[in-house]
Amino acid sequence: MNKIVFEYLFEAVEINSVVSLEYRHTTDNAQAILVKTKHGDSYKIAVIRYKPDSDCATTNNKVFEAHDAGLVISTKHYAAAIPWDEIAALYTEAVKN
């Protein structure tokens, strides 16, 4: 994973809040997760799965973890794994704009 790409994503999500997450229903036990940039562009980047037994404190609590395969985003009831190549594509698109 390119360190600059990761730092950009981390800054966008954790510090500047220029990227927000939106959930869209797709099936009974899964929803699409969208990344929305500050310019209003939405990118479908993963499918998240319902996890009823979560130990996150609140619904709004988001946890971001970097793994070899990609970025893992967890909320109280959902978890999504986003491949690094899709994050790099999102970063490249954002830079073009």
Language-model segments: which ranges?
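Short glycine-rich, low-complexity segments
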Residues: 1-39, 88-91, 95-97
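N-terminal functional modules and adjacent low-complexity/disordered segments of proteins
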Residues: 1-4, 59, 82-85
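Short linear proline/tyrosine/threonine-rich motifs used for host-factor recruitment
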Residues: 21, 33-35, 47, 57, ...
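Structured surface patches comprising rigid loops and adjacent beta-strands/short helices at the edges
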Residues: 18, 48-53, 78, 83-95
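Residue-level signal for the start and early helices of compact helical domains
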Residues: 9, 73-78
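Acidic, low-complexity, intrinsically disordered interaction modules
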Residues: 41-75
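Short beta-strand-initiation
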Residues: 28-30, 68, 77
